[in-house]
Amino acid sequence: MALPDFSMRQLLEAGVHFGHQTHRWNPKMAPFIYGERNNIHILDLSQTVPLLNSALKVVSDTVARGGRVLYVGTKRQASDIIADAGNRSAQYYVNARWLGGMMTNWKTISNSIQRLRKLDELLAGEAQGFTKKERLNLEREREKLDRALGGIKDMGSVPDLMFIIDTNKEAIAIQEAKRLGIPVVAVIDSNCDPDQIDYPIPGNDDAARAIALYCDLIARAALDGIARQQGAMGIDVGAQVEAPVEPALQAPAEGA
């Protein structure tokens, strides 16, 4: 595998260059702004391209050395896309609500994850010994915990890198990452503060098509990292994803 490719045309078609209304801008974004049209800031895609490439490389490199990447996007138009990207690339995600202390108070979060696992076990069986009402209450508790923590249930500890959609909405997540020294990759729109972000990607953070494009590229970069890690461990990645080799073709390899 290799880092995912993308073109300037794809960025344009997804509306990555459209910022917010000019009166809503953050002056710190001035270096990333190309101009304005109809009172809307236009972001400079000639900067987005190399910065997005750098972000994809850091995601791939992090995963290749066995690191974990946490995707964060809780706004309505990002929620499903973030979860899909996390699942597809064997990474982790928060897509409902960022709970304060999710990273900085990992011990408490771990206890809640243990409770979620326990509920999974209880409800996977027949849940014998519970009344209908008790079972319903357990299901509700499980649903609430799964919504908040399902995407990080198997993470094991704090991540090595975070990828964020909407730095204003996810300000608490960024603060916690900074406190723990976790590097942050994030899309920065014209109303964002780029100073907080280690690997900024100047672009629209509201349009569903733009969000889908970023998440697809980040997920594919993570998959590239997995392939590189497995290659370094001597695992034949092709054998895992391709159809089984014909027995007749295997014979020479066995004798080699």
Swiss-Prot record:
Belongs to the universal ribosomal protein uS2 family. GO terms for molecular function: structural constituent of ribosome. Keywords: Ribonucleoprotein, Ribosomal protein. It comes from the Bacteria. One of its GO terms (biological process) is translation. GO terms for cellular component: cytosolic small ribosomal subunit. CDD domains: RPS2 (cd01425). It comes from Brucella melitensis biotype 1 (strain ATCC 23456 / CCUG 17765 / NCTC 10094 / 16M). This is Small ribosomal subunit protein uS2. NCBIfam families: rpsB_bact. Pfam families: Ribosomal_S2 (PF00318).
